[in-house]
Each structure stands twice: as structure tokens, then as C-alpha cells.
Amino acid sequence: MPKIYRVVGDTSTGMKFVVEVVGERPYDALEKVYSVLGSRHKLKRTQIRIREVSVVEPSSAKSNEAKMLMVLEKVVRY
């Protein structure tokens, strides 16, 4: 069952971040954060420092995208 994870950390450029992502386990959430920050800010994995990964209840999540993904029963890719 997927869960919403809140990932807190900072980068070597001094930028702090809090990202909420949906994943089956914490490892999946970390991979998504590395992917998103790498593509948006052109950061390498070694430039991203993860401070905390925690499970968040859907009712207390701040990300609308994460809330909507939790409502879906299944996703079909073509």
C-alpha cells in the first residue's frame, strides 16, 4: 500500500527543501526526490543531503499532488 513520505534535507548550494512524495517504501521516496531535484535544479546525488524521511498521514499532507495520488485505486500505463 503506498504511503506519503515527507523528505527533509538541504543541498550543497545552501537550498533547504521539504518534499512530499508517494511511495511503497522509504527507498522509493528517496529515489523520487533525487530524480526531481536532479532534473529541476541540475544537482547530483552527492550534492543532496537527506536529513529526515517520515511517513505522513494523508489528512496532514500539504502536497495536493500526493493527496490525489493516494485516492487513486490503480494507475494504468499505456
From Swiss-Prot:
The keyword Transport does not apply. One of its GO terms (biological process) is translation. Keywords: Ribonucleoprotein, Ribosomal protein, RNA-binding, rRNA-binding. InterPro entries: Ribosomal_eL20, Ribosomal_eL20_dom. It comes from the Archaea. The keyword rRNA-binding applies. One of its GO terms (molecular function) is structural constituent of ribosome. GO terms for cellular component: ribonucleoprotein complex; ribosome. It holds the Pfam family Ribosomal_L18A. NCBIfam families: PRK00773.1-1. Belongs to the eukaryotic ribosomal protein eL20 family. Part of the 50S ribosomal subunit. Binds 23S rRNA. This is Large ribosomal subunit protein eL20. It comes from Pyrobaculum calidifontis (strain DSM 21063 / JCM 11548 / VA1). The gene is rpl18a.
